[in-house]
Amino acid sequence: MHSTEVQAKPLFSWKALGWALLYFWFFSTLLQAIIYISGYSGTNGIRDSLLFSSLWLIPVFLFPMRIKIIAAVIGVVLWAASLAALCYYVIYGQEFSQSVLFVMFETNTNEASEYLSQYFSLKIVLIALAYTAVAVLLWTRLRPVYIPKPWRYVVSFALLYGLILHPIAMNTFIKNKPFEKTLDNLASRMEPAAPWQFLTGYYQYRQQLNSLTKLLNENNALPPLANFKDESGNEPRTLVLVIGESTQRGRMSLYGYPRETTPELDALHKTDPNLTVFNNVVTSRPYTIEILQQALTFANEKNPDLYLTQPSLMNMMKQAGYKTFWITNQQTMTARNTMLTVFSRQTDKQYYMNQQRTQSAREYDTNVLKPFQDVLNDPAPKKLIIVHLLGTHIKYKYRYPENQGKFDGNTDHVPPGLSAEELESYNDYDNANLYNDHVVASLIKDFKAADPNGFLVYFSDHGEEVYDTPPHKTQGRNEDNPTRHMYTIPFLLWTSEKWQATHPRDFSQDVDRKYSLAELIHTWSDLAGLSYDGYDPTRSVVNPQFKETTRWIGNPYKKNALIDYDTLPYGDQVGNQ
């Protein structure tokens, strides 16, 4: 007599499905729920995170007996992406957006690691450990979600069709929208779910970079500025543009800050009548790439894409017959693959002074002084020299020699309630300003010593919030949560005796005018004596026809994101903020 053992078929379990959903939802929906509870956003983020996190159920349905392996592999990716977004929210109180990702991708991994070290704290470590522990606990509860064949294929396809294929088909074939627009809309819906915000952000970054690379490759094909005139003719001259970094004027004694952070510029201002200090210039965007796309071109907050289609300041000066130079102490990954490098390559000769593998290295801005001297001695009759500094860029203590920490441990004129770590950063920033003062003053002095015919303009690309605004707990820059200190910048003009002799002008009546750095190209054209179709004297801060207009700040690519800088609350301040 033979006996047969019948193996029972596995049954579908709602409990197993529930744990699988909870596991995948955890990585995205937790943060969206926190954002909703805080009142920062509505329910769309929760809805989309729930929907698109459910896509990870497809491999679980198709291979139920391998759920632990599948969930572990996918979970590591989701954990890393979602933890980064959660920590960003803890630090800034804002959602991790594509705009932030764009800045991260452009600044390169070395700079990103420097940001991580700046914000590394016990609080972040504890949050990360707790977050990881919950994720691991949920993973241990996973069991096979068994759906009989062929229904597992039907359910999996239904998920894929409902969330991905149907929106694409509907928008592309029924509504006749461009396929690229359809993908952009879908990516926007998927963004609240990890790790799609990283993938869509990188996709947009590559698109933007390709556009700029194309602009560089086709630079000679751009039509020159029409009806172009240079009132100075062919007389030899040298013009200098110094671009600072992360330096807000409210922390400069030159602008009334009680700590002596700019002694050399203070002395120059008192003794040299040719140095003009403008008191009311603000940047339009608190990020280097985004503001230089405006300051060095005809783009602005209302027309942010003109940098792609119209000549830049570098193109304009080459059209005027200048030999152009770019000297930078900003880190460059390669000579061609960053947006800053695209701008620099529009000049005739470049000096890349920072070759460190990591930005967390003591590579000081005094690096630019020797090549600056070399370029001053170049025999070209007409020269434009652009100098790009690291300035007071985070991490501040790397911007000055270790033995020059004048304000280390100093508690004078410090906001109340700072922790020891915050006080250290506050003082480091002032030390960085002190060293930046030496570099900028040295550039002016070296330029003056060359007995040039020309002028020098210095500004910082944007400011920096370093516990300046009550409740004194914010450091860095966040366009979605702006403070005045993120936008207030120094703006200096030094003119040589020879230039003044042939271009006599009194700027004393101009120094308090409200001005946006986004309009720089018009001021530069005015100073250089250039005119052309598109030049607008009402947008030059040194022109008698100047008209004050709204100083827009914010992300111009985000709906209803532009705001008037002058509506921002003041908080604590010094000087003209």
Q: Where in this protein do the model-derived segments appear?
A:
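Membrane-interface soluble catalytic domains
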Residues: 2, 6-22, 38-42, 62-69, ...
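Flexible internal linker/loop segments at domain or repeat junctions
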Residues: 403-424, 473, 498-504
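A broadly used, surface-exposed interaction patch
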Residues: 386-388, 430, 481-485
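Active-site rim elements
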Residues: 40-43, 189, 301-304, 356-359, ...
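Transmembrane and membrane-interface helices of multi-pass
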Residues: 1-190
